[in-house]
Amino acid sequence: MRIDIITLFPEMFEPVLNGSIIGRAQKSGVLEIVCHQLRDYAFDKHKRVDDTPYGGGMGMLMKAEPIALCFEDVCKQIGKRPHFVYMSPQGKTLKQQRLRELADVENICILCGHYEGVDQRLLDEFIDEEISIGDYVLTGGEIPAMVFADALSRMVPGVLSNNECFTEESHFNGLLEYPQYTKPSVWRGKEVPEVLMSGHHANIEKWRKEKSIEVTALKRPEMLEEYNKK
C-alpha cells in the first residue's frame, strides 16, 4: 500500500510514521508513506494556499487550485488515481470496519485541512470520502491524518508480524478486548486468573470471549447492542 499525505506541515509526520512498526514496514517495502508540501503547488510569490471566504465570515479558506495541482501530481507519480480522503469533523466517524475495507485499497491520498476548511468546489470535484476521528475540532487535519494512517497501516498484510496482533484487539470483531496479564503470576496479592495458566486452549478461548462481552457491556454498551444484532 502507498499512502500520500497532502499537508502544510510534512515535518509533523516524520517522527510518527517513520519510526517503530510503521517505519520498519516502510523499510521492508510492505508500505510506503509520502508527504507532500502543499505550498510547493502555490505559484504566487508568497506561496499562499488560503484566502478570504466569499460572503464574509471568520478565518481563511484553503484554495482549490493548489490542492488540485498537488493531487494531480500524486496521480502522475503513481500512475493511477488514488482514493482521496479529506480529514474533516463533518466526515463519517472512523470505525474499524471501514479500516478493514480500506486495507484492500492499493493507493490512498489524505488531505489535511487547515484554517476554516477547504473551498467546497474542490471537495465536490475531487474528494471521494470525508473521515472524522471524533465529534470535536482540532487546529488542523495533521493529527487526524496520523491517526488514520497509523490505524490503516497496521491492517495491511505484512506490517504486523501476525494477523492475530490486530484480529484479537478491541473493535476488530465488534467487541472490546479481554483483560490481559503478564508475569509475575501474583502481584501485590492479586493473582492472574487460573484459567490463563491452565494451558487448556478451549477454556482460555471461552474465558476470553466471556470477558470481552463483560468488558464491552460495562464500557461500551452501545457496541454490545450492535454486536448482538449480528
Residues covered by each model-derived region:
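N-terminal nucleotide/polyanion-binding subdomain common to many enzyme families
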Residues: 1-75, 197-225
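Hydrophobic/aromatic beta-strand patches that form the interior of the parallel beta-sheet core
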Residues: 4-6, 34-36, 85, 108-109, ...
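Short glycine-enriched loops at secondary-structure junctions
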Residues: 38-41, 114-118
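Short, well-ordered secondary-structure micro-motifs
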Residues: 46, 96-98, 121-123
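S-adenosyl-L-methionine/SAH cofactor-binding core of RNA-modifying enzymes
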Residues: 63-114
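Charge-dense polyanion-binding interfaces
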Residues: 89-90, 170, 218-230
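Structured adenosyl-cofactor binding patch, chiefly the S-adenosyl-L-methionine
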Residues: 122-169
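Internal, active-site/partner-interface "lid" segment
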Residues: 143, 155-194
